[in-house]
């Protein structure tokens, strides 16, 4: 068994453990390469069907190709696709660079706050109607208490301290000093009532592993990641005011 197979097996195991042990699960899908690999692994884990709702935070500043890709795959793969948005911040122009705040405040309003209140059910959520091919108000306002996320330990320092099953407080706060030990594939899956849980099936993957797996599995990804003949491509994807292409022939 090669290294990619080992990573895949562990991720599939964690996804199945999460689904078996936790209610009100959701999976974040940023439309980027990491969360798309996570989505692919979820399809493998459940034999082509993803029984977990996909959640996307739409800032309204995403590059158009990203939204087109999201909705196309959601229809092709029959995904339960939900998005949330901070519409009040957009209306009040608490945005960057065309509004009244800097990029950090914009990111907090359109991403962090939107995510928190979307998961809690306090703000409206919109679900894809596969028949009409439009998003409609989701009548289910029950909070998501477990969220599957495609973070990797090698991305930055704080994430290297994460766990596969990482508890948060009721306010979604992370206490790095109060994380359960995880040894020899033994994971804690029982937590106190009210605990919000983050699940990280890609924790041991590196960026190189992600690209190797995308190539091996022929996973469809956003075309922006690749040079379209102009010597430019995006290494990471996000909102267009803060995302830039790099020189590359890849």
Model-derived regions: residue spans:
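Nucleotide-activated chemistry modules centered on ATP-dependent adenylation/adenylyltransferase
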Residues: 1-250
């Amino acid at each position: 068994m090669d290294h990619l197979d080992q990573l895949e097996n562990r991720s599939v195991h964690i996804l199945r453990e999460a689904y078996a042990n936790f209610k009100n699960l959701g999976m974040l899908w940023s439309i980027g390469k990491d969360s798309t690999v996570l989505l692919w692994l979820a399809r493998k884990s459940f034999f082509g069907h993803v029984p977990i709702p996909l959640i996307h935070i739409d800032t309204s500043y995403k590059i158009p190709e990203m939204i087109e890709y999201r909705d196309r795959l959601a229809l092709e793969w029959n995904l339960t696709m939900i998005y949330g948005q901070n519409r009040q911040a957009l209306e009040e122009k608490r945005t960057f660079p065309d509004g009244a705040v800097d990029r950090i405040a914009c990111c907090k309003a359109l991403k962090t706050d939107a995510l928190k209140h979307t998961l809690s059910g306090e703000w409206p959520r919109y679900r894809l109607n596969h028949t009409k091919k439009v998003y409609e108000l989701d009548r289910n306002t029950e909070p998501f208490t477990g969220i599957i996320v495609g973070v990797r330990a090698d991305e930055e320092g704080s994430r290297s301290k994460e766990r596969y099953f990482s508890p948060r407080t009721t306010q979604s706060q992370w206490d790095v000093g109060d994380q359960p030990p995880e040894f020899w594939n033994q994971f804690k899956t029982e937590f106190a009532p009210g605990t919000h849980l983050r699940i990280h099936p890609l924790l041991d993957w590196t960026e190189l592993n992600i690209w190797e797996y995308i190539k091996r599995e022929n996973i469809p990804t956003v075309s922006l990641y690749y040079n379209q003949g102009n010597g430019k491509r995006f290494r990471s994807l996000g909102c267009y005011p803060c995302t830039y292409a790099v020189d590359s022939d890849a």
